[in-house]
């Protein structure tokens, strides 16, 4: 591990010098590439340097404990040594996590698909609330949200919404949101105060570039139709809405939010690429899981991942047993604590798998 860290620190120093080189500074493409590589190593190298500082401090403290004759000073040195050793252990664990192979999709933009499931109007209202929650969280991260396609319900909810979220680390933060989100509450139309249960499905897909997934023109069929609003009524007399069918997989994407057919087609292709890319990623994950003879983090969308219980003012994530009691704040986009808990959990799982594989 430490030989690898030494090599990475040397690479970091090399990149630091390169960023000051006129040859790099005057070439925008080279500078961006070098700066990106430098940024990816910064946290790891800083943590490794902290580790080395702590080991030097421990060496000095041990020497002081061994040589000190004054009882009070010896006790002070021993206390300091214990604290340094505890910090060293924590930093070493951090280094192990930072050395885990990065998910190549972590820095990608994402396509978020939210669909109302069981529960009728109540499910559509909750779908709209979830979309607002992700919007508010995106604002805190300074990400850009753009709706690609949406279908409203007659009560002001959303039957479906597909949006792209653009920003650094979007996939790394929201990739664990895929699955079934269950809501328990008393609908406004309920006269007897009974709690109803509804469900909404969320899918988070890394946006695929054209280099990630190639789609041949012969493999798609594009149909055009008039845009429609809630209830199916036509809202546009021109054929601006598009339906794209990927013939080999029978994957269908519809987009009608823009008045321009060209823009709807562009948005539809972005969604199609993301869905086909996810299929390829899932095939690879399934093959890897089969090889290991165990299912490894499939992110199954049919899995119930979270329950939002309004009468009890709590949110529970069933995968890690994490409960939040400030439901209104959570729905207002304050979801970072849960995101960090999920990230820590799955990093620990990866470490466990890595340790098992080595042994």
Swiss-Prot record:
Modifications after synthesis and translation: Methylated by PrmC. Methylation increases the termination efficiency of RF1.
Phylogenetic placement of the source organism: Bacteria, Pseudomonadati, Acidobacteriota, Terriglobia, Terriglobales
Disulfide bonds: none
Any Gene Ontology CC annotation: cytoplasm
Keyword line: Cytoplasm, Methylation, Protein biosynthesis
Subcellular compartments: Cytoplasm
Stored InterPro entries: PCRF, Pep_chain_release_fac_I, Pep_chain_release_fac_I_sf, Prokaryotic/Mito_RF, RF-1
GO molecular function, one term: translation release factor activity, codon specific
General function of this protein: Peptide chain release factor 1 directs the termination of translation in response to the peptide chain termination codons UAG and UAA.
Residues the record lists as N5-methylglutamine modifications: 233
Similarity-based family: Belongs to the prokaryotic/mitochondrial release factor family.
NCBIfam families per record: prfA, PRK00591.1
Protein name in the entry: Peptide chain release factor 1
Gene3D superfamilies: 3.30.160.20, 3.30.70.1660, 6.10.140.1950
